[in-house]
Amino acid sequence: MSAMQVDVVYALPERQYLRTVKLEEGSTVEQAIVASGLLELRHDIDLQVNKVGIYSRAAKLADVVQDGDRVEIYRPLIADPKELRRQRAERSKSKP
């Protein structure tokens, strides 16, 4: 099996983490995240809670990554999008 490169990213409002890792073909999203070292660096990442994706598309930890993929670790939502839309709609109705 040959080696491939995969980027693993995790973004916070104040800082972004980007790690490039070398993996064997057939490696999974979870293996890429573990190899990146981000789990040791950021203890707030919980793979049972945080969703993950590849190039902005939802992925599972067991999905196989391809050479050049960008694995993304997403932060949990802090607000309900439906509730925010409802509040904006109410505010726009009350404006003259």
Curated annotation (Swiss-Prot):
This is Protein RnfH. The lineage of its organism: Bacteria, Pseudomonadati, Pseudomonadota, Gammaproteobacteria, Enterobacterales. InterPro entries: Mopterin_synth/thiamin_S_b (IPR016155), RnfH (IPR005346), RnfH_sf (IPR037021). Gene3D superfamilies: RnfH-like. HAMAP family: UPF0125_RnfH. Belongs to the UPF0125 (RnfH) family. Transmembrane segments: none annotated. It comes from Pectobacterium carotovorum subsp. carotovorum (strain PC1).
